[in-house]
Amino acid sequence: MTQLLDDNIVMTQAMSFLPYKKPFEERIAKWEAQLSLVSSTLEAWIAVQRNWTYLEPIFGSPDIMEQLPLEGKRFATVDRTWRKTLAATERAPGVLAACASPKLLESFVECNKLLDSVQKGLSDYLETKRLAFARFFFLSTDELLQILSQTKDPLAVQPHLRKCFEAIERLTFAQDLAISAMTSREGEVMPFDKEMYPKVRLGIGSLGHK
């Protein structure tokens, strides 16, 4: 679609240099302006879609919304605009019909600004978590987000323990989710002197002192 649009823009611009353009000059200029608007709108649209698709499952987590309330509100604003736009597009499909309004481009530009600020806030937040617990640097961004989006579930750390602690294969959880022991990669079980009742955001660091 974008290639076809670019081709049409090039052809329209070429028409403006034809010697016999005079009778059609106004129509050519109008058509070129419309194609340019559609191109800019599609570019902004794709950017919103890409960023929204990445952030939607992250801010779909109540834990992340609780930890990043400002970014959560900004994302919610974009989410409403995005879903409203999709609904309108379903009612009136077609590129020209969907992208002919300058207001839509302005809306997408604003959405992209908000999404950029959300991304920055999220990156800064993850950096503070890594600085507070250096072993989080061993995890990818997606892996760290998996943990932080399930802060009420201590079991969420289990798949990532080997990256954070070379010697730990898994933890032993009681029914009340207290941690009573850890198992090494060699299969050796090491009971704790005292059971731990961790919160994911705070308690994982205590393992380094056991």
Region locations from a protein language model:
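Extended amphipathic alpha-helical elements
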Residues: 1-210
